[in-house]
């Protein structure tokens, strides 16, 4: 399917090695994009920035491992915030996926503000990378 993209989410309930193997198998079967997730496997014990990092750590680890194993783009999702989105890119993800960061809000203006914050955070990584 040359003009149709297929994105497949690798379940976080698998071990990291099993996630990598599944991602490789999915790409071999025709998946064009692999998405990681963290699900409920991480329960932050801290608040603030440290809590955001704790929450996203399973999906960040999966993005790192999978992006080094497959030749297709990897999207990092679950627990992604303006703090952790740059970490996802540094881990090897081609981009991020957000859901609850947006849909938990009741105000469309706040939803747009969250997306703008994510874009700004990721652009700062690209600017820093280009400066090196």
Task: Please annotate each region the language model reported.
Residues 1-76, 81-132:
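Alpha/beta enzyme core
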């Amino acid at each position: 399917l040359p003009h149709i993209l297929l994105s497949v989410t690798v379940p976080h309930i698998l071990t990291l090695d099993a996630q990598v193997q599944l991602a490789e198998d999915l790409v071999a079967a025709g998946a064009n994009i692999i998405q990681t997730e963290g699900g409920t496997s991480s329960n932050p014990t801290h608040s603030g920035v440290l809590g955001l990092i704790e929450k996203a750590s399973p999906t960040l680890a999966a993005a790192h491992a999978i992006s080094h194993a497959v030749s297709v783009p990897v999207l990092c999702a679950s627990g992604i915030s303006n703090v952790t989105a740059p970490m996802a890119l540094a881990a090897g993800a081609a981009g991020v996926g957000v859901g609850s960061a947006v849909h938990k809000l009741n105000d469309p203006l706040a939803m747009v503000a969250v997306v703008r914050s994510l874009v700004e955070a990721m652009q700062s990584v690209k600017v820093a990378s280009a400066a090196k």
